Amino acid sequence: MQLTVKALQGRECSLQVAEDELVSTLKHLVSDKLNVPVRQQRLLFKGKALADEKRLSDYNIGPNSKLNLVVKPLEKVLLEEGSAHRLVDSPATPIWQLISKVLARHFSVADASRVLEQLQRDYDRSLSRLTLDDIERLASRFLHPEVTEAMEKGFCK
């Protein structure tokens, strides 16, 4: 069936999908067509937000239906995600918010989101590769900087 997805900023696209398609799959198609990251999308049908895990047929969305797309600001998305899973895996959310604001000044919303996601993946990968020896070495440098300086000069106190 043919659907039209219209963003509040005026852009729109037509998509060919199955009636039993998942909303999450539709979001990926919208991302490809309108260049809006999936995590920033909120799709509405007749004023009701669509849940990713549900199917279009669950909302009685039929051929030639029109869906509205609300693009969530990147900062809001990061706050939502931060409260969910970043507390354990990543540093405190404020640093990612700050980085997000800096990126937003230099890139489009979509590009800033991609750069931030890649930066977070690289950061997580680097942290996961740290050994206990690496962590002990870092801790010693922070807790006893005078010893580290002496060792770098070639002698200990």
Curated annotation (Swiss-Prot):
InterPro entries: Ubiquitin-like_dom, Ubiquitin-like_domsf, Ubiquitin_CS, Ubiquitin_dom, Ubl4_C_TUGS, UBL4A-like, Ubl_UBL4A-like. There is a cross-link at K48 (Glycyl lysine isopeptide (Lys-Gly) (interchain with G-Cter in ubiquitin)). Signal peptide: none annotated. The modification Phosphoserine is found at S90. SMART domains: UBQ (SM00213). GO terms for cellular component: BAT3 complex; cytosol; membrane; nucleoplasm. It is found in: Cytoplasm, Cytosol; Nucleus. Pfam families: Tugs, ubiquitin. GO terms for molecular function: protein-folding chaperone binding. Keywords: Cytoplasm, Isopeptide bond, Nucleus, Phosphoprotein, Transport, Ubl conjugation. Polyubiquitinated. Ubiquitination by AMFR and deubiquitination by USP13 may regulate the interaction between the BAG6/BAT3 complex and SGTA and therefore may regulate client proteins fate. Residues 1-76 form the Ubiquitin-like domain. Residues 96-138 are annotated as: Required and sufficient for interaction with BAG6. PROSITE patterns: UBIQUITIN_1, UBIQUITIN_2. Gene3D superfamilies: Phosphatidylinositol 3-kinase Catalytic Subunit, Chain A, domain 1. One of its GO terms (biological process) is regulation of protein stability. Component of the BAG6/BAT3 complex, at least composed of BAG6, UBL4A and GET4/TRC35. Interacts with BAG6; the interaction is direct and required for UBL4A protein stability. Interacts with USP13; may be indirect via BAG6. As part of a cytosolic protein quality control complex, the BAG6/BAT3 complex, maintains misfolded and hydrophobic patches-containing proteins in a soluble state and participates in their proper delivery to the endoplasmic reticulum or alternatively can promote their sorting to the proteasome where they undergo degradation. The BAG6/BAT3 complex is involved in the post-translational delivery of tail-anchored/type II transmembrane proteins to the endoplasmic reticulum membrane. This is Ubiquitin-like protein 4A. It comes from Mus musculus (Mouse). The gene is Ubl4a.
